[in-house]
Amino acid sequence: SKYCFCGSMDLKDYYDLMFWNQDDHYLVHVGSNKGKLALTNEFEETKLDLKDDMKKIEFTDKLKNKDISKQYDNPDWKTKGSDKCLSCAACTTLCPTCYCHEIKDEVTLTDLKKGDRLREWSSCQLKSFTRVAGDHVFRDARTDRFKHRIFHQLQYFKERYNVEMCVGCGRCITHCPTEIDFVQIINEFEDKKKK
């Protein structure tokens, strides 16, 4: 994908197989024993000269600085990102690591002692996601929701688990109907900072 920035993320220890599309075939790098097992069961080993293929792999280290901690109050989040955002949740629906959900209780009206507690997939980009009793919404402004997703992917998760949540696949950018490229936005912040 032209929007892939996986080279910017700390993925060296966190994959089974990495695929690079080379038009009529794929280059595959094995990253774990599970990945090796998957290949030995499904494919025959071949010996190829990959020098030309390796030159074709697009450089994917596109994010200039993952430390966005000092950018939270930057007013450009609104003008460059959230003003264009439709809150459609395409970014979070297609993200392989987003896991936001809501809990709902369904009570059986014929027997009030029975019911189900359900976890439904949701999105932090939806205004209703942070709505609580009393109709209070914690992230009412679209800018707050927009920033929250990016900070959760690159900052908050890393602070807690010491690894970025984002894998850099670029699906959120590729499928955004208004073509919001948060990597480009962060890089512009970085360029401004250097001036």
What are the roles of these predicted feature ranges?
Residues 1-3, 94-96, 137-139:
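N-terminal start-of-chain detector that recognizes signal peptides
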Residues 35, 81-82, 90:
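Small-side-chain structural scaffolding
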Residues 65-83, 101-175, 179-195:
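Ferredoxin-type iron-sulfur electron-transfer modules in oxidoreductases and energy-metabolism complexes
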Residues 1-74:
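Iron-sulfur-associated redox domains of electron-transfer enzymes in respiratory
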Residues 5-7, 86, 96, 125, ...:
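Secreted/luminal cysteine- and crosslink-motif detector
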Residues 88-89, 169:
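A short, glycine-centered helix-capping/turn motif at helix boundaries
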